[in-house]
Amino acid sequence: MERPLVFYSISLFLGCFFSIIFNENIYITVIIMLVIHIIIYLTLKEIKFTIIMFLFSILGVISFNLYFSFQPKTGALIRINNKYDYKVEGTIKGRKLILKNNIKKLEEGQLIKVESGDFKRNVVYEKGIIGEYNIQHYVLQNRDFRSKIYNLKRNINNKFINSLGKKRGSIVVSLCFGDSSYLEKEDKDNIKKLGVIHALSVSGFHLALVYKIFEIIFTMKFAIIASYLYLAFTGFKYSTIRAFIMILVLKLSDKFYGEYDSLSSISLAFLIILFLKPYAFMEIGFMLSFLSTLGILMFNKKISKYIYFLPSKLNSAISLSLSSQIFLIPYSSFTLKELSIGFLLGNIFFMPIFSMIIIIGVIGAILCPFKYIFNVVVLVLKNLCIILEGSTYILIKVCPDLIYIEEIFGIFIISIYICFMMYKAGKVKYKYLPLFLLVAVFFNAYTVFPKVYILKNEKVKATIIKYKDESIMYCDYDLEEGKYIIELKDNFNIDKVITNAKGYLPIHIKENKLKAINFYKEYFHKNIDNYEGYDIICMKSNDYKEYKIIFGKIFRIR
């Protein structure tokens, strides 16, 4: 069988996937895996290959259950990964857990030994969290390699921010080391609008640049070691682990075998990461990294051939940008719910600047003990940041806003892909099938009958009204809770926000006037009662009520 690693990685994924579907019930999962692989055998007629695939699926089931059935014991060593205002996230033997109670003095990167505390199993599958540890007493362990890395990273981050200023320093730190915690929301929104938000989280692009720098200056072995150190320095992100494995396979194949298959390489990376972290396929960052790379591997050269008449640099930038989005767009419609129309502009104009900032920034991090050399690096970075700010200002003016997309759009894109493949295979009659889904996409985007969303929690009260191509939100909230309003505006794709409105203001809907401003006013009290309170407001969850007004009658949708 050609490219067996592709099939083995799919089998491992199926084992993990069905394990979560059937909530760790091993017996049902194994039976389903057996049935699937019997069908595979009847199709391929290859018994040895099918058995190996089945074993990989069983490996996925075992890995998943071993991960989530783990029970920490007193005296366990826990690594502190992330610290928030109200909780701390740590890892114990590769498993994530939430730490509570005695956590005020904990810092990221520290290694602690829990002397006393209670563990409560509270699994969050999509984040790989096995439960909560209520810590009573702990002992801080001596600094090891990873804690020293965390401390070094903090010092370097602070040095860049102090030298460049908070705004520019945070951009450099985000681009070079993937730490966007210092970044201002305005900068994040601008970069997101331009479709280059991936540059703020360390990706394979970053690691490839770092590897190339050290390979040119030194040797391949030194470059691999330096890349691994960069991997550790940036926190072992999925995208960098994937890129490191693929680079390692590429260099080893060049040296020992002379043949490199990119699809087998990415499949091996997928298999290794999923075996170690069987929940990874539920994390958006993992899927974005693999789907974008898969799109590049499969379609970059094909797109490049179609635009052969363009200059080579422009051809490369456009083909890379378009191919990386082929699988990301449908996936984003099911998860992120938003799409940047200006991603092509962002990638063409920004990626060269980002590349220079990353290269100079990494060199600056290495040479930061040398004051005068570091000052020269800071001067270069300042000028690059000025160029970046000017480019951002211009492109933001011409780049269209993010658009909100729903699942039906993703289904439409997938149908186009399927119909195109069938058309290429000679099934000409299927080429018009996406047109039927296009009608559904239109009616989904254009609200024929008015929709009303009712939201309420302890901090924010809001009514959202959508009609035709417009959407208005009326909300009542305290000034310090403004971040919730921003979240609502982004998640519901709001055109206009009216805050703390008094009395009734008419909204014209066909011949009728819908006089609903604050949902706690009498109009909706006559039709809707028993409001629930929620802790989180997000359209991606079910924390809202939806109503549709059809010919003056109100119907509850959810």
Which residues fall in each region the model found?
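Transmembrane helix-bundle segments that form internal channels/tunnels in multi-pass membrane proteins
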Residues: 1-77, 214, 302-457, 464
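Hydrophobic core segments of transmembrane alpha-helices in multi-pass, intramembrane catalytic enzymes
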Residues: 7, 29-34, 223, 227, ...
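Aromatic-rich juxtamembrane segments at the membrane interface
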Residues: 14, 19, 133-247, 251-252
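Membrane-interface helix caps and helix-loop-helix hairpins in membrane proteins
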Residues: 20-24, 231-240, 256-259, 275-286, ...
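Structural detector for short beta-strands of small beta-barrel domains
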Residues: 68-92, 116
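Non-globular, low-confidence helical/coil segments that flank catalytic cores
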Residues: 101-106, 112-115, 144, 209, ...
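Flexible glycine-rich surface loops and low-complexity tracts that mediate binding to linear polymers
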Residues: 108-126, 131
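Short hydrophobic alpha-helices at membrane interfaces in multi-pass membrane enzymes
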Residues: 220-225, 258-272, 308-316
